[in-house]
Amino acid sequence: ILFAMGGPLVLHVIIPRIDTLVGADNNNPSPEEIKLLEQDPYYARLVKSFIPIQYAANIYACYLTARKETSLLDKVLLGMSMGAINGIAINTAHELSHKASSLDHLLSHLALVPSGYNHFRVEHPYGHHKRAATPEDPASSKMGETFYEFLPRTVIGSFKSAVEIEGARLKRKGLSFWSKHNELLQGWSLTGIFHSSMLGISGRGAVPSLAVQSAYSIM
């Protein structure tokens, strides 16, 4: 059980504790240093290297859920641990979604595949950044709004926004929403392939873990 719930423990207990012990770091790079750092490929490689680690962890978790001795509780806890990893991957996707390269956009989608949150790749750079902190932005919380009020509004609203944005982009090019060039359909197809593969490897026993990890990562 302790191993299965390792993700939430690290994310919500150990890292915040270390953060408190280390304290605030007030040393920020200068504008000149930032320009040099942006040109250093090390940081881009560091971000991208998380994706194969993410997939290896998800595949291993599916292997564990396929074992007969793995209890339902352990499957749920494993799902939470994978949700913690795939939630971090949404941050990875965020960084890559702002790049101009189509390869980076594909990698952004791959990072979002386990969570199934692929519409984020479209909505965040083209919707949220355009309307941030305005009433029209589903990704900005309202004053006094609780987390549980904000969560369904942002998930549903961001999904609708992404569909509208991608539909408008395709329309400008004279293409149908159902075109093979639809980035949302491409991302959702990858998600379908991933989850079908995990079920094929682990069987129906993986359903609780896969469902929990997806929900937990988005939260």
Task: Indicate residue ranges for each PLM-predicted region.
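Membrane-helix interface/capping segments
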Residues: 20-36
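Membrane-interfacial segments
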Residues: 25-26, 30, 65-69, 93-101, ...
